[in-house]
Amino acid sequence: MEGPTHLKATNDHRYEEKTRKREERETIDIRKEGSRGEKNNMDIISILPAECISHIVSCTTPQDACRSSLVSHLFRIAADSDIVWERFLPQGYKEIISSSLNSLSKKDLYFHLCNHPIIIGNGNMSMALEKQSGKKCYMVGARELTAIWGDTPPYWQWISLPESRFSQVAELNYVWWLDIKGYIETKNLSPRTTYAAYFVYQLSSQDNPGTAATPVTLCVAYEHSAVAVEHSVILDPVTYEGTAPPHARYRGDGWFEIEMGEFVTEEDNATVVCSLVETSDYNCKSGLIVEGIELRPKE
């Protein structure tokens, strides 16, 4: 004869078994419902015209468009369409691209502009696109910069280098005062964007230690602004005698760059001034080669 303890254990086991089976049924029902929901969503998507999906994708970003192409074959067709990538190209792009690029799809043209800057502004500026966002990147070439005694041959000279995107770059022969400025109109940049400005340069084999080791003052500010943040750096891309950490970064294209500062494009008709100055040390400076000042959206 079974005792009370054995009956209780049997009842507990039956209860646990019923509970387990009920939970399994509920899980199966949930999965079926989820599957039906996903199927319904895919059915809704499948009945949308590809052009409609393209318009939806065009309201996102280039990065999101690339991701959406992985969803399905239909999405890939829509995400690769000219409707999408035309939206990501800068306004007025047809006026500045070469006729040889007209045969490219809008997507191929977009990535071409990301990887191959276009020379504009009488050959003294370049424009490219930032790959993830499609925002504009600009470089102001040395010919568009102003420098003390920049037009005086004994102090500066114009040379050609194969690694430069421009036909000419500026080489410093010798000066005692170093003052270089670049002026950028915000209407040429992407609106409501934080930009960083970079001084792009080399130091020649005839570099004077006074150029590489002497701190220079960098500043980026709106023209006529009462607020201007300055900071000092050294141009030497390696630590100079252990006195300071290097500020320069090798770009991988034969040039070094130093971040000058940042700003936000809040106005369409404002001018930003980027400056590099050293006028307190009267040592002779030479051997600096300037390609330009580049402006890129801040990550």
Summary of predicted features, one role per range:
Residues 1, 24-27, 105, 229-231:
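Short intrinsically disordered, low-complexity coil segments enriched in acidic
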Residues 38-77, 100:
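N-terminal Skp1-binding subsegment of the F-box domain
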Residues 2, 34-36, 80-81:
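Membrane engagement elements in two modes
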Residues 14-36:
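Intrinsically disordered, glycine-rich low-complexity segments
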Residues 8, 26-28, 40, 51, ...:
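Residue-level marker of intrinsically disordered, low-complexity segments enriched
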Residues 47, 55, 73, 77-78, ...:
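Plant-skewed but cross-kingdom recognition/interaction modules and surfaces
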Residues 5-13:
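Extreme N-terminal basic, low-complexity initiation segments
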